[in-house]
């Protein structure tokens, strides 16, 4: 074995000592790494996983610092969009705030926050400042560490809000799932890659997470102070300084969720459903209950196509009937929207600088492309979809049963259920049984119950409708931006080249992968979903909590025929109360026994629909398909994904097999206490980051014309996202 050369030894010394960065920047990076421990609440419960937090903090340090070092050494000059961002930031460093490069179309938030970071600005004279390329890039490493901490706090608050909505008790625990999820978000290939370059994406995402964290704290209270409202406006405007499309995430997503929160805090008294015989009276009763705040908003794992319709309808009625309460909650977001509108009017358009190449165009295929994007990067999260297939293969191999028996038993079970009742999203809608003492409802009401209560009827129609709509989008609205065709430095160039540009029929054939990817990503956000019909049964975490019904169920197809006078026996969430010492001790013991106890709760239907609306609005006006545009939608989706235990979706399959063998039983116990997908997701991201980083750093090339003439002055080109 040969020894390392002095030059190699020097390089490694520079890497780990940080001498290649200015002293203030080194101090900032160390401060960023220490940030979680400095801000970490001192009164955290014992099961708040500080060791796991420390492990991921230093894992992020060991990944991001060498990445920045390698980029600085091998790509010392500004590359691609950096040739616009870095000179503009350097102008700001010199105090030339009125000079602007018209080729830059995004606001100056990145340049402004870079100025207030110690070490980025180095004083060379009385009023002369200079920002070096490496120090400006180092700011994004700092921003990535801040983003990881914000993601941790956001996931913690999401779990707390969902737990409080179910049990009306305050949750102060920081779960292992929240810690690992946050740092997987920081390792997300697009965020990690651009943390080594001076791009706006990392800082913009962190800014949105600041506003999102503030929003999550606001919905933890019934009422908010004027100071909280002013802070919300300030944070909303702050996000707009990084990217204009952030307005959709602040105003539509967060504002929409707060409008739903305002309606749900009405807390109407629970009443029995009267015996109603006509459709008109049934709809009147439904509208009256909605106006009081008795809305229909089941958890995502229990959502069916009709639930989406009645969720929107019930929330709309409740908001229209309680406008003052809703406006009092969302006026900060309305103000943010008005301020943004004033800027657009003053600027003469949404984008800054050159508007010719950034003309807003309706581009709905973006909402088809995003699902394969999610599915590819979150491939390990789709493991639950493989277990039913694995079980079917296992049964086939051992000749115990066939895969057809699963389908037939499921159909028989559903037939028996539908013959006696029509199930709604979280309750059972009783239909007249023979010999019932109740009078017969009208034919219109019976038809209404069958159409909107039968999931077997609605689900195929919904699936067929989405497929037809997708074909229409592909046929009438496929747009290929000139930048996509002209720039072979981006991976998207090759994706388009070998898929939708290869042949017209491929565009239409891809509708099936789009649909499957959408189904899987929505099912992942739903947790243990009913799309698996009876294959999960009571083993699903979301069903094994005892009181499995949501308090927000008001389906108009529910009628009282004597079986049950109410759709749900769950009480509406009361004001959240702090636990006393004994209750806190009991909760801590429960969380110690089951670390995923508070992490398996899925978001509500309204949250999923508002997320879909915000994603659509933020993408549909962009003619250019750019993976960086999908970063914030992915981050928000990833934060909403609940935890998964290995036995979920798998009551009688692989998990049961592992439990029967003494050698594999400890492994099963671990997988029921820790989400296996997180570990696989970490390794998946490491592989993607290693491959794309290696290609970017070591596979440069020179642009040449068809006749061999060197283009772009012979500058090296590199592959990137």
Curated annotation (Swiss-Prot):
Its main location: endoplasmic reticulum. Residues 406-437 are annotated as: Disordered. It catalyses: an alpha-D-Glc-(1->3)-alpha-D-Glc-(1->3)-alpha-D-Man-(1->2)-alpha-D-Man-(1->2)-alpha-D-Man-(1->3)-[alpha-D-Man-(1->2)-alpha-D-Man-(1->3)-[alpha-D-Man-(1->2)-alpha-D-Man-(1->6)]-alpha-D-Man-(1->6)]-beta-D-Man-(1->4)-beta-D-GlcNAc-(1->4)-alpha-D-GlcNAc-diphospho-di-trans,poly-cis-dolichol + a di-trans,poly-cis-dolichyl beta-D-glucosyl phosphate = a alpha-D-Glc-(1->2)-alpha-D-Glc-(1->3)-alpha-D-Glc-(1->3)-alpha-D-Man-(1->2)-alpha-D-Man-(1->2)-alpha-D-Man-(1->3)-[alpha-D-Man-(1->2)-alpha-D-Man-(1->3)-[alpha-D-Man-(1->2)-alpha-D-Man-(1->6)]-alpha-D-Man-(1->6)]-beta-D-Man-(1->4)-beta-D-GlcNAc-(1->4)-alpha-D-GlcNAc-diphospho-di-trans,poly-cis-dolichol + a di-trans,poly-cis-dolichyl phosphate + H(+). GO terms for biological process: dolichol-linked oligosaccharide biosynthetic process. It is a multi-pass membrane protein. Its EC number is 2.4.1.256. One of its GO terms (molecular function) is dolichyl pyrophosphate Glc2Man9GlcNAc2 alpha-1,2-glucosyltransferase activity. It holds the Pfam family DIE2_ALG10. InterPro entries: Alg10 (IPR016900). Keywords: Endoplasmic reticulum, Glycoprotein, Glycosyltransferase, Membrane, Transferase, Transmembrane, Transmembrane helix. Belongs to the ALG10 glucosyltransferase family. This is Dol-P-Glc:Glc(2)Man(9)GlcNAc(2)-PP-Dol alpha-1,2-glucosyltransferase. It comes from Gibberella zeae (strain ATCC MYA-4620 / CBS 123657 / FGSC 9075 / NRRL 31084 / PH-1). The gene is ALG10.
């Amino acid at each position: 074995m040969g020894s390392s050369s002095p030059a190699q030894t020097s390089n490694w010394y520079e890497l780990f000592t940080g001498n290649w960065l200015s002293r203030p920047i080194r101090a900032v990076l160390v401060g960023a790494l220490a940030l979680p421990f400095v801000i970490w609440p001192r009164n955290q419960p014992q099961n708040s996983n500080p060791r796991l937090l420390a492990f991921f903090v230093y894992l992020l340090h060991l990944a991001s610092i060498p990445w920045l070092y390698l980029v600085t050494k091998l790509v010392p000059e500004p590359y691609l969009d950096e040739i616009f961002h870095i000179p503009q930031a350097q102008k700001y460093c010199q105090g030339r705030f009125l000079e602007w490069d018209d080729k830059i179309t995004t606001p100056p938030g990145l340049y402004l926050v870079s100025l207030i970071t110690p070490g980025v600005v180095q004083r060379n004279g009385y009023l002369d400042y200079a920002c070096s390329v490496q120090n400006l890039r180092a700011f994004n490493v700092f921003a990535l560490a801040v983003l990881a901490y914000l993601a941790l706090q956001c996931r913690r608050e999401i779990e707390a809000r969902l737990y409080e909505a179910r049990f009306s008790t305050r949750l102060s625990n920081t779960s292992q799932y929240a810690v690992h999820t946050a740092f997987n978000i920081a390792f997300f290939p697009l965020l990690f890659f651009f943390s080594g370059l001076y791009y706006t994406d990392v800082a913009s995402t962190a800014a949105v997470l600041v506003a999102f964290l503030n929003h999550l704290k606001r919905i933890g209270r019934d009422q908010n102070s004027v100071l909280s409202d002013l802070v919300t406006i300030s944070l909303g405007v702050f996000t707009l300084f990084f990217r204009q499309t952030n307005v959709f995430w602040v105003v539509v997503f967060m504002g929409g969720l707060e409008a739903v929160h305002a309606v749900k805090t009405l807390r109407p008294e629970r009443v029995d459903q009267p015996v109603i015989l006509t459709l008109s009276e049934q709809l009147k009763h439904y509208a009256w209950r909605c106006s009081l705040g008795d809305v229909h908003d089941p958890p995502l794992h229990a959502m069916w196509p009709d639930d989406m319709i009645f969720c929107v309808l019930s929330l709309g009625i409740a908001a229209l009937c309680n406008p003052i309460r809703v406006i009092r909650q969302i006026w900060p977001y309305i103000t943010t929207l008005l301020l943004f509108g004033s800027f657009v009017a003053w600027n003469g358009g949404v984008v800054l600088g050159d508007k010719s190449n950034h003309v807003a165009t309706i581009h709905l295929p973006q909402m088809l492309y995003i699902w394969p994007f999610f599915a590819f990067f979150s491939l390990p999260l789709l493991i639950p979809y493989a277990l039913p297939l694995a079980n079917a293969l296992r049964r086939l191999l051992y000749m115990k049963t066939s895969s057809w028996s699963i389908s037939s038993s499921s159909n028989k079970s559903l037939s028996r259920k539908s013959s006696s009742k029509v199930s709604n999203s979280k309750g059972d809608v009783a239909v007249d049984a023979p010999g019932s003492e109740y009078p017969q409802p009208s034919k219109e009401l019976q038809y209404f119950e069958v159409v909107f209560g039968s999931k077997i009827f609605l689900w195929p129609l919904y699936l067929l409708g989405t497929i037809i709509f997708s074909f229409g989008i592909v046929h009438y609205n496929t747009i290929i931006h000139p930048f996509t065709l002209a720039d072979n430095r981006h991976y998207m160039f090759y994706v388009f080249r070998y898929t939708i540009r290869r042949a017209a029929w491929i565009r239409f054939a891809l509708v099936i992968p789009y649909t499957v990817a959408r189904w899987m990503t929505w099912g992942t956000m739903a947790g243990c979903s009913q799309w698996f019909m009876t294959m999960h049964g009571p083993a699903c975490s979301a069903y094994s909590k005892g009181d499995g019904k949501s308090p927000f169920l008001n389906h108009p197809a529910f009628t009282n025929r004597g079986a049950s006078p109410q759709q749900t026996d769950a009480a509406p969430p009361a004001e959240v109360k702090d636990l006393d010492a004994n209750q806190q001790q009991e909760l801590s013991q429960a969380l110690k026994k089951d670390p995923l106890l508070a992490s398996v709760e899925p978001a509500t239907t309204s949250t999923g629909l508002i997320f879909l609306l915000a994603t659509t609005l933020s993408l549909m006006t962009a003619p250019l398909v750019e993976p960086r545009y999908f970063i914030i939608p992915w981050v928000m989706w990833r934060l909403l994904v609940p935890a998964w235990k290995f036995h979920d979706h798998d009551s009688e399959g692989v998990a049961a097999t592992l439990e029967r063998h003494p050698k594999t039983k400890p492994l099963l116990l671990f997988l029921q206490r820790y989400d296996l997908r997180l570990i696989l997701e970490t390794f998946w991201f490491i592989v993607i980051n290693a491959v794309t980083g290696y290609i970017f750093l070591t596979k440069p090339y020179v642009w040449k014309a068809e006749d061999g003439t060197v283009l772009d002055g012979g500058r090296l080109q590199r592959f990137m996202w």
